[in-house]
Regions:
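Basic/polar N-terminal segments that are highly enriched at the extreme N-terminus
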Residues: 1-5, 113-115
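N-terminal first-folded block
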Residues: 5-40
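Short acidic/histidine-centered micro-motifs embedded in hydrophobic/aromatic stretches
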Residues: 25, 29, 72-76, 96
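Amphipathic protein-protein interaction modules
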Residues: 41-91
C-alpha cells in the first residue's frame, strides 16, 4: 500500500487499520535500522520491539496525531489494550497513551525512505 493510501484509510476508518498492514506499509516504503528508543518510562534497546520502533518512527515522519498513531497498532490497541484497561501487556502502547509524542525519543534514525 502506498503511504498516501494508508494515510487516507487511517483518517477515514482508523478502526479498520491492522498492525500487519501498518508494518507492511512501512517496510515497502522505508529502510529500517534497529535503534534504541525511549517511550515514556520504558527504554527499548536496538532490535527490541522493532515493530513499535518502526511504527513510531513512521508516525513521527508522517506527523500523525497520538490517536492516529495508536490506531496504527490495530487490534493490539482497539481490542487488547482498550479491552483491558488495567492490563500490563503492550507496554509501548500503554506508555504512549500516557506520555504521547513528548515521551518518544529515538537514539538514532530508524527509517530512511527507499530510493
Amino acid at each position: 500500500m502506498t503511504i498516501q493510501a494508508f494515510i487516507e484509510k487511517l483518517k477515514k476508518t482508523p478502526e479498520t487499520i491492522t498492525f500487519t498492514e501498518t508494518i507492511a506499509t512501512v517496510e515497502s516504503n522505508y529502510e529500517f535500522t534497529p535503534t534504541a528508543f525511549q517511550n515514556g518510562n520504558q527504554h527499548n534497546g536496538a532490535g527490541e520491539n522493532s515493530g513499535s520502533c518502526k511504527l513510531f518512527a513512521f508516525a513521527k515522519i508522517q506527523q500523525l496525531t497520538q490517536a492516529e498513531t495508536l490506531a496504527c497498532f490495530g487490534a493490539y490497541y482497539f481490542e487488547e489494550v482498550l479491552g483491558d484497561p488495567e492490563g500490563t501487556n503492550h507496554q509501548n502502547i500503554r506508555n504512549f497513551m500516557k506520555s504521547g509524542w513528548d515521551g518518544i525519543k529515538f537514539e538514532d534514525v530508524a527509517l530512511v525512505p527507499k530510493a
